[in-house]
């Protein structure tokens, strides 16, 4: 009797992502993987290692350090890279650092442009990368929902959402002119729940900030901001209070809101995800900048 072999949903997503990695490597000469330290980046690196096992990754990791990441993120990054024998490039906008750019006095929009978008463009230009892997997913935000898996960028690293190439089935067009590049998103068809279920299945390590712990929190403009270091200026009457919270998404600590939660394990996070109705990026302050929307940021070069 013939048996029928079927892949589970997670294994289908895994196979698609591995195919995207291998297809991209066959088409591009100088790729790099943007490593943001979050859960999606951890899954992305895990999939890349599977795609090219038993060899080492055929590209380096690139981290854009805005200087305001959570301290736990930087500690995790350094340990993760060492334990997995990875080549990591860390880049910061030195002009922004010299000018003292920060999210408090410059505002989230200008700070993000200088310390993230401009820093990313600097690093990509210096490295002359023709392909950049990223962990963005279509379920995160509406501008990402309409973006291709192979997302074309012009010689200025800018994205034109009205000038996207058709993607038929699993056929990806990587043909570009000199100076142009492609952003590649192997996790495009994954959801936040898929990510956590895969983390559970594969026992992937992630930053502890994703799990509920007592943390020093200031409630500001409806967001729960963690006082991660003494650079956070407190307003009159503000005092950090210990509250049991976790983060669904990670970024710069002054611009990333926590959620109250009791989910202390991956299993409990999966159970929480089955009930939530809010987008994970609803707690990212930079996504609520009005005319500085995510789509506008992406047009200007943001990932």
UniProtKB/Swiss-Prot annotation:
Keywords: ATP-binding, Nucleotide-binding, Nucleotidyltransferase, Transferase. It catalyses: sulfate + ATP + H(+) = adenosine 5'-phosphosulfate + diphosphate. The keyword ATP-binding applies. One of its GO terms (biological process) is sulfate assimilation. GO terms for molecular function: ATP binding; sulfate adenylyltransferase (ATP) activity. It is an enzyme of class 2 (transferase). Transmembrane segments: none annotated. Its EC number is 2.7.7.4. InterPro entries: PAPS_reduct_dom, Rossmann-like_a/b/a_fold, SO4_adenylTrfase_ssu, Sulfate_adenylyltrnsfr_sub2. Pathway: Sulfur metabolism; hydrogen sulfide biosynthesis; sulfite from sulfate: step 1/3. The keyword Nucleotide-binding applies. Belongs to the PAPS reductase family. CysD subfamily. NCBIfam families: CysD (TIGR02039), PRK05253.1 (NF003587), PRK12563.1 (NF009214). With CysN forms the ATP sulfurylase (ATPS) that catalyzes the adenylation of sulfate producing adenosine 5'-phosphosulfate (APS) and diphosphate, the first enzymatic step in sulfur assimilation pathway. APS synthesis involves the formation of a high-energy phosphoric-sulfuric acid anhydride bond driven by GTP hydrolysis by CysN coupled to ATP hydrolysis by CysD. Heterodimer composed of CysD, the smaller subunit, and CysN. This is Sulfate adenylyltransferase subunit 2. It comes from Akkermansia muciniphila (strain ATCC BAA-835 / DSM 22959 / JCM 33894 / BCRC 81048 / CCUG 64013 / CIP 107961 / Muc).
């Amino acid at each position: 009797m013939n048996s029928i072999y079927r892949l589970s949903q997670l294994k289908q997503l895994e196979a698609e992502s591995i195919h995207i990695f291998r297809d991209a490597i066959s088409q591009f000469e100088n790729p790099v993987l943007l490593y943001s330290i979050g859960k999606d980046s951890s899954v992305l690196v895990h999939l890349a290692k599977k795609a090219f096992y038993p060899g080492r990754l055929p590209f380096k990791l690139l981290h854009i350090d805005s200087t305001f990441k959570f301290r736990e993120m930087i500690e995790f990054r350094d340990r993760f890279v060492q334990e997995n024998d990875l080549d990591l490039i860390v880049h910061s906008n030195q002009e922004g650092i010299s000018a003292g750019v920060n999210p408090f006095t410059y505002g989230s929009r200008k700070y993000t442009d200088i310390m993230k978008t401009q820093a990313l463009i600097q690093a990509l230009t210096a490295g002359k990368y023709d392909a950049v892997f990223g962990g963005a997913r279509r379920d995160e935000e509406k501008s990402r929902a309409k973006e291709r898996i192979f997302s074309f960028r012009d010689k200025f690293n800018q994205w034109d959402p009205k000038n996207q190439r058709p993607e038929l089935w699993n056929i990806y067009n990587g043909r570009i002119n000199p100076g142009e590049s492609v952003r590649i998103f192997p996790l495009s068809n994954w959801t936040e729940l898929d990510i956590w279920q895969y983390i559970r299945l594969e026992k992937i390590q992630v930053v502890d900030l994703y799990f509920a712990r007592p943390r020093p929190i200031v409630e500001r403009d409806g967001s729960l901001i963690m006082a991660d270091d003494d650079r956070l200026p407190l307003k009159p009457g503000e005092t950090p209070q210990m509250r049991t919270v976790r983060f669904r998404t990670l970024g710069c600590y002054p611009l990333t809101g926590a959620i109250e939660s009791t989910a202390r394990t991956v299993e409990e996070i999966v159970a929480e995800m089955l009930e939530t109705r809010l987008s994970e990026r609803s707690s990212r302050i930079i996504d609520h900048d009005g005319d500085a929307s995510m789509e506008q940021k992406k047009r200007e070069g943001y990932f």
